[in-house]
Amino acid sequence: MSAQQLSDLIRFARHNSPYYRDLYASLPPDAGRLTDLPVVDQVSFWAANAPHDSRVLTGPLSEATVYKTGGTTGSPKFSVYTRDEWRTFVTAFGQGLVDTGLRPGHRVADLFYAGELYASFLFILDSLAHAPVDNVRLPIGGGAPLESTIPTLRDLAAQVLAGTPTTLCRLAEQVLASGVRLGSVELLLFGGEALFEDQRRLLATAFPGAEARSVGYASVDAGLLGRPVPGADARVHRAFTPYSVVEILDDSTDEPITEPGRPGRVVVTSLFRRLMPIIRYPAGDRAEWTGTGPGHFRILGRAEEGVRVGPVSLYTQDAQDAVASADTAGQVVGMQLVVRRWEGRDGLVLRLATAPGDERAGELTGGPAAERRAALARAVVAELETVRPLYPDSVRAGFVHPLSVEWARHRDLAVNPRTGKLVRVLDERPTA
């Protein structure tokens, strides 16, 4: 399926999708520019896109592949692609793989995850199959035991390893522990989460002849986001023109940012998806234009709509729902998600503010109030782990630190200095 004109896509979505029809109800009939349109609210979007009787889809779900987005069970979010849309998706992404350093004849191990409606393994495998250069694909998967993965990589002389940073680092640790040398590996393609400096050092030790680069920037819900830009900064990508339009919007006003170096949130419009239109959809990341080339931008981390902790994706709504379910007494009046990185792993802290007048909000030094807060903290963590079971699974696997709760007074919660609005997610990890 080829990309379509934006104005045609808007008209089609308005006419055939009940969700977009309602969203654009107050707009003039000829609204045909992105700036004419509101930004999609993720909560209402996914509430409307139920597995049955979706109000987002423009037609019946009779020919498509269904994928799950959000990374877990609980309240699953489903993203659908027709066969033509998927072909366009993987062909465009496959073209971008050349920018990563993929060369003719490269033997590429796909170490992303498969099954349970997850897309990453199939997506990378299909993108490699549609790449404009010949390559040899090794569909190993991220769930295969490292004890068998390493001999397979050695015996088949794999030259490129593609996977999440977490998977690549676990492999690197096993390589170093076993003393095996995978001398043929020359390229490490990472995706799905940020690659930090401590991880780069580990990968360089295990694979001294390999360079780590971004495999590209995409998601199963938002679609095509960024094609890799060769260079020293793996965070820099460029838009997949003409298949998608990337905007960077001001955090306070939602006005498009045009000048380099000014951070904002990433919003994407897919020009090739018609069954499940994606128009001004928040990708969940923050970025800034670099000014180094047309459409070049640097990814800066996750935005408020979502957060990535190691291999786990969470939405702020997940944490809010967990607090609402556990806090039957209404003790919590504010919440922030704080993502930190220490000892080589990511960790998520739930910063909870108690009701005004609780002068001991930041203390847990005994007494009935402290006991109630401790019990509430355990209940909130249990609720969130139930909704996002991949998190405790990742804790047990050693990928991330356990969830924790940090108590605060409401005035201690970080706010936007320009608007006074609460900042839902604080990403305190290094950006490079």
Residue ranges and their predicted role:
Residues 1-68, 74-91, 95-99, 349, ...:
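Nucleotide 5′-phosphate-binding alpha/beta core
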Residues 135-137, 212-213, 246, 335, ...:
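Generic structural signal for residues in well-ordered beta-strands
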Residues 161, 267, 272-395, 420:
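AMP-binding/adenylate-forming catalytic core of the ANL superfamily
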Residues 189-190, 216:
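A short, hydrophobic beta-strand element of the alpha/beta-hydrolase
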Residues 195, 201-292, 304-305:
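Conserved AMP-binding/adenylate-forming
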